[in-house]
From Swiss-Prot:
Role played: Ligand for members of the frizzled family of seven transmembrane receptors. Functions in the canonical Wnt signaling pathway that results in activation of transcription factors of the TCF/LEF family. Functions as a upstream regulator of FGF10 expression. Plays an important role in embryonic lung development. May contribute to embryonic brain development by regulating the proliferation of dopaminergic precursors and neurons.
List of glycosylated residues: 295
Native organism: Felis catus
Family: Belongs to the Wnt family.
Signal peptide interval: 1-25
Disulphide connectivity of cysteines: 76-87, 127-135, 137-157, 206-220, 208-215, 278-309, 294-304, 308-348, 324-339, 326-336, 331-332
PTM entry text: Palmitoleoylation is required for efficient binding to frizzled receptors. Depalmitoleoylation leads to Wnt signaling pathway inhibition.
Domain of life: Eukaryota
Keyword line: Developmental protein, Disulfide bond, Extracellular matrix, Glycoprotein, Lipoprotein, Secreted, Signal, Wnt signaling pathway
SMART domains with a match to the protein in the record: WNT1 (SM00097)
Name the record gives this protein: Protein Wnt-2
Residues covalently joined to lipid (O-palmitoleoyl serine): 212
Length: 360
């Protein structure tokens, strides 16, 4: 019994490194890094050489990406607001989400997709606002074109989403492309699904010109929809995410359950089932649901029964200031009174184990 273990022991650290996936998107930490571009590029942990090259070469793009982190994390938290895992971030952790994303779960699939989408959105918006040296409005949208309503002229500033997608692919995917393992392929797939989701909601907007708005002439441009549309779409993909396994040659996926269809480029994929997130678990990165607010009248994921994992809940009586007796005044204002409202707040009980609140 001891001989095989003795032979394996020197290689154990390497084996553990290979078996344990790494939370590779260290660029997520860019939201917390200030200072000059050189300071930022050299102090974000975990960036690969290609990412550092792009960081030094395009500091204005990096600033846009860093500002965008707050936007897509807020979107993630909005989508998961009624779930046991609520996309909570850890300020002192360079992976931003802690160990929870080490598992190749549905939640990891969503976070990689929405973060990749957030980079596309942030860069494309910065291009249109004239904040970047390397891009501007879409140069291809010039001259005359035709749609179902007739001819129109390209004008205004069409969002240059192709540039946003190209840069996001080069920067976000750089670290995954260095890996050959299953998790890297999963991340690449979900990153691409996120980028495609933003382009899906690119819409044509037009302005009419002519006597009394007769629309004898139209000027049109392409504009991204609000990021909430992308978030809602990816949330639907999260709920329909497809569990996969690596194929035999290690180059792609097959569905884990043969009854399900093969995933498309728009679908999210994952390998491992999620933990229940009921209790604090250091290894799983779960903070648990003790102290979370629950909805006593709901039958959904935010219900006290589901959110509290059957542990029960505490009720506290609180008062809050709200707007009331609002009236419309001509013209054009709405005036309200400040009123105190009494309500009950229900929060999940802690597990009976004495160590549930130990810091992670």
């Amino acid at each position: 019994m001891n001989a095989p273990l003795g032979g394996i022991w020197p290689w154990l650290p390497l084996l553990l490194t290979w078996l344990t996936p790494e939370v590779s998107s260290s660029w997520w930490y860019m939201r917390a890094t200030g200072g000059s571009s050189r300071v930022m590029c050299d102090n974000v942990p975990g960036l690969v050489s290609r990412q550092r090259q792009l960081c030094h070469r395009h500091p204005d793009v990096m600033r846009a990406i860093g500002l965008g982190v707050a936007e897509w994390t807020a979107e993630c938290q909005h989508q998961f607001r009624q779930h046991r895992w609520n996309c909570n971030t850890l300020d002192r952790d360079h992976s931003l989400f802690g160990r929870v994303l080490l598992r190749s779960s549905r939640e990891s699939a969503f976070v990689y997709a929405v973060s990749s989408a957030g980079v596309v959105f942030a860069i494309t918006r910065a291009c249109s606002q004239g904040e970047l040296k390397s891009c501007s409005c879409d140069p291809k949208k010039k001259g005359t074109a035709k749609d179902s309503k007739g001819n129109f002229d390209w004008g205004g500033c069409s969002d240059n989403i192709d540039y946003g997608i190209k840069f996001a692919r080069a920067f976000v995917d750089a670290k995954e492309r260095k890996g050959k393992d299953a998790r890297a392929l999963m991340n690449l797939h979900n990153n691409r699904a996120g980028r495609k989701a933003v382009k899906r909601f690119l819409k044509q907007e037009c302005k009419c010109h002519g006597v009394s708005g007769s629309c004898t002439l139209r000027t049109c441009w392409l504009a991204m929809a609000d990021f909430r549309k992308t978030g809602d779409y990816l949330w639907r993909k999260y709920n329909g995410a497809i569990q996969v396994v690596m194929n035999q040659d290690g180059t792609g996926f097959t569905v884990a359950n043969k009854r399900f269809k093969k995933p498309t480029k728009n679908d999210l994929v994952y390998f491992e089932n999620s933990p229940d997130y009921c209790i604090r678990d250091r290894d799983a990165g779960s903070l648990g649901t003790a102290g979370r607010v629950c909805n006593l009248t709901s039958r959904g994921m935010d219900s006290c029964e589901v959110m509290c994992c059957g542990r029960g809940y505490d009720t506290s009586h609180v008062t809050r200031m709200t707007k009331c007796e609002c009236k419309f005044h001509w013209c054009c204002a709405v005036r309200c009174q400040d009123c105190l409202e009494a309500l009950d707040v229900h929060t999940c009980k802690a597990p009976k184990s004495v160590d549930w609140a130990a810091p992670t």
